[in-house]
């Protein structure tokens, strides 16, 4: 299972951003994840990225601007790719039983969240502050998880033994 940080770096490779901009964004994500947004200074970002502090601000103006650039890339590319990888792997019709299907999904997502807890924390905490991020995240979840899982759930409903409900 690839990390969000790795996926983020991969999406930046195919972007129109300069090498220095990519270095600033990758370093910022790493630092925001490790020590928090509030504790990360522009000087730390510059040092970690191997650029001058002036370079950081010439590209992104503020730390908020850096975070916005990271989150927009997350919402446009990283999260949809991560969910698509998960959906392709977990939502295949023909699962053994509903309980095994459900258990595998929950276990997979718990491992994913554990492995990416700081990046998930950044995204979720920002979605509490910014309603547009929250709405976009909701749309991504509906289109990338709810819609693909519906046919699988319908298959389980067809096989469900209704007498188990009546007991």
Roles of regions detected by a PLM:
Residues 42, 72-78, 83:
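Short, basic, alpha-helical segments at the C-terminal edge of helix-turn-helix-like DNA-binding modules
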Residues 37, 60, 124-130:
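Short helix-capping/turn signature of helix-turn-helix
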Residues 12, 135, 157-167:
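Hydrophobic/aromatic-rich alpha-helical bundle segments in the mid-to-C-terminal region
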């Amino acid at each position: 299972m690839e990390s969000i940080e790795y996926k983020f770096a991969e999406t930046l490779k195919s972007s129109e951003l300069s090498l220095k901009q990519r270095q600033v964004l990758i370093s910022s994500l790493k630092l925001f994840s490790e020590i928090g947004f509030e504790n990360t200074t522009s000087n730390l970002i510059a040092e970690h990225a191997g650029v001058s502090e002036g370079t950081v601000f010439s590209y992104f103006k503020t730390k908020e601007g850096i975070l916005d650039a990271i989150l927009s890339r997350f919402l446009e590319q990283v999260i949809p790719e991560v969910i698509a990888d998960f959906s392709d792997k977990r939502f295949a019709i023909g699962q053994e039983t509903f309980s095994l299907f459900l258990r595998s999904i929950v276990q997979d997502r718990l491992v994913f969240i554990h492995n990416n807890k700081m990046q998930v924390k950044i995204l979720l905490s920002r979605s509490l502050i910014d309603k547009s991020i929250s709405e976009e995240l909701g749309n991504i979840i509906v289109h990338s998880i709810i819609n693909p899982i519906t046919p699988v759930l319908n298959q389980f409903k067809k096989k469900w033994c209704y007498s188990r409900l009546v007991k």
